[in-house]
């Protein structure tokens, strides 16, 4: 048997400590930022099964496209987790807790920080009397280019890349009333 603990990162240890899981069962959590050691040692077969994706209730994802990072307390359990993961995903990566913590940080930058920038763009567009919809084709193309490029840096555009200081200064002036947005822009 495999028991997956799919709760918020901060709840993994507490939930695991309270679960009535039979001896000999495998227990794995799905949290990217939580080390394997967060699972109590009373579970002889401990593991991590981290699908690196953002999940939203009611929104379908293609699990085959989602990289799954695995780690286990033994090579045998790692093999079991890998076999399970390969039934769901085309990309399975064996990863220790330190590497997984870094990939989780990278995921936060790539997903959450980018989304925060979309929200800032939405606010600026609304200040100009426009809906976020006007930015959606740009968001889609930017994400597609970043996905398809060797590196996102290869497809960076804008006044900074072009060395167009005059445009950058005008943009910064428009952000005078919002020091935080101005700092992000720089």
Each language-model region and where it sits:
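Short, glycine- and charge-enriched coil/turn segments that flank and shape catalytic ligand pockets
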Residues: 21-24, 129, 176-179
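A general structural signal for well-ordered alpha-helical segments in protein cores
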Residues: 12, 36, 78-81, 106, ...
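Glycine- and other small-residue-rich loops at beta-strand/loop junctions that grip anionic moieties
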Residues: 4-5, 70, 159
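Internal alpha-helical scaffold of NAD(P)-dependent oxidoreductase catalytic cores
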Residues: 60-148
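Interdomain hinge/lid region at the active-site interface
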Residues: 142-186
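Rossmann-like NAD(P)(H) cofactor-binding subdomain of soluble oxidoreductases
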Residues: 1-60
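Charge-dense polyanion-binding interfaces
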Residues: 30, 83, 183-186
